[in-house]
A protein has these predicted regions:
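Dinucleotide-binding Rossmann-like beta1-alpha1 core, especially the glycine-rich loop
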Residues: 1-52, 173-174
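Residue-level signal for well-ordered alpha-helical positions
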Residues: 30, 55-56, 138-139
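A short, glycine/Asx- and small/polar-enriched loop/turn
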Residues: 22-25, 53-61, 103-110
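Helical element adjacent to the flavin cofactor pocket in flavoenzyme catalytic cores
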Residues: 64-123, 127-131
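Flavin-dependent oxidoreductases
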Residues: 102-174
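Short aromatic/hydrophobic contact patches that present stacked aromatics
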Residues: 14-18, 64-66, 152
């Protein structure tokens, strides 16, 4: 449902680069799979990479793929918008209320037991991050989520850096 609330989403696309022939072969397989699902993908040579990402040091890059419709959003902004939209529809949000147990009946969630008592409900949003998988196991629900470490850098503004650069991924550099 459209709420008119902004998530801060920016659709700048995404580039994944390959610095080995093996990684490039993997990217080509992934691009083919994406195209079978009607996802727009462009296979990139070094020249096209520099056009799309002019600040990229591309001497040791074999090639890459570009997905122009990929987007990014601020996770905190998305969380706040989802919470506000849910409240607009009558949902109640309980912060700082640890759940001890998810209550079920006939394979359906009927509520949660917290340290403040039982909360009966028709729906539960498990916003428990990396603990969601463990919580799901307790009620025989598979949550295909695994902890994964990500790296990013924070810098001062970089002069003349285009503001609409695609997200850049280099799995060989991590």
């Amino acid at each position: 449902k459209t709420t008119g609330l902004s998530t801060g989403m920016k659709q700048n696309g995404a580039i994944t680069v390959a610095s080995t022939k093996e990684r490039m072969q993997e990217l080509l397989r992934q691009a083919t799979t994406a195209q079978l699902s009607d996802v727009e993908v462009e296979v990139l040579n070094k020249k096209r990479l520099k056009e799309l990402y002019p600040v990229l040091h591309s001497e040791d890059i074999v090639g890459g793929v570009y997905m122009p419709k990929d987007a990014q959003a601020d996770p905190v902004g998305v969380t706040n918008v989802l919470a506000k939209a849910a409240k607009m529809e009558g949902a109640k949000i309980f912060e700082k209320t640890p759940v001890k147990k998810i209550l079920t009946k006939n394979s359906r969630i009927i509520g949660v037991e917290t340290d403040k008592g039982i909360i009966n409900c028709e729906y539960v949003v498990m916003a428990t991050g990396m603990w969601s998988r463990q919580l799901g196991e307790e009620i025989n629900v598979s949550v295909p989520l695994y902890p994964n470490e990500h790296f990013y850098i924070i810098t001062e503004p970089i002069k003349n850096l285009p503001q609409n650069l695609p997200v850049l991924r280099d799995y060989n550099a991590c």
